[in-house]
Amino acid sequence: MKILKRIWVLAAVMLLCTSQVYAGTAKSGAGKKEAAPETQYSKDGKWIFLGDSYGTHGNPSLPELITGCLGVTNFKSYCRGGYGVAKKSGGDDQRFVSRILSAAIDRSVKNVMIIGGISNDRKHSKEELRTNMSKLARTIRAKYPNSAVYYIIPNWHANWKGGTVRIQTARLYQRRVLLRLPWYKELCAENGFIFLDKVSQALRKSANDNFFIYDGHHPNVLGRQRIASAVASYFS
């Protein structure tokens, strides 16, 4: 059943990606493209996804849409809502690294993509993030020694006009959280991760567009498709 579902998702997403070659990048002047590490990327290699609810929300999910756009069928998602780089809640370990500690070493993995985490890490200091990002990097390299590692944080900078109290609250919340975004870019650079900035900004939008569900920051299917198309554009 899982195989049939993936085949269906792949067919639907490939159709979507051919018709939508990330128009948002063109609008925002993204002709200046980040260089893709061609020696690492391979459609034949396995993909691993680590992330929070950005990687689990919706059907098809963001990992399914990304791999569909890339024509990749061999992937595994370890995403789970509420997780982050450094997050611990009481005695509960909700760090990304905890999701792969028991995973077997897999040299067939060529690409690891980390999605989100910034809102769940909001109570942790920069030094806590640094310590845990370093541990995450060491663990990924031990488990998947042939992989390149990418990090995306889907952008919440939306031009909401008016709106409900819920949306206004989400807007204030996201501004506070995204003040920490430079930390993630810096720590990715320190650990050899590739922060896909243009992909992370795929949801910048005009007031007439709507890429989010009711909570104001999780992408709806259109938003997820836009992010997936941005990833495909990066690798094209």
Q: Can you say where each PLM-predicted feature lies in the sequence?
A:
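Generic structural signal for well-ordered alpha-helices
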Residues: I100-L101, M133-A137, L181
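Catalytic His-Asp segment of secreted/periplasmic serine-dependent ester chemistry enzymes
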Residues: W156-S236
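A cross-domain feature marking catalytic cores of carbohydrate-active enzymes
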Residues: G117, Y151-P154
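Proline-centered loop/turn at the N-terminus of a beta-strand
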Residues: V112, S147-A148, I194
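N-terminal secretory targeting modules
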Residues: M1-L50, Y54-N59, E64, G68-T73, ...
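Hydrophobic, well-structured mid-protein blocks that either form specific transmembrane helices
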Residues: S125-P145
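Active-site phosphate/pyrophosphate- and oxyanion-stabilizing loops and adjacent acidic/basic residues
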Residues: E64, R138, P182-K185
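Conserved SGNH/GDSL esterase-like catalytic core that processes O-acyl groups on lipids
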Residues: Y41-T131
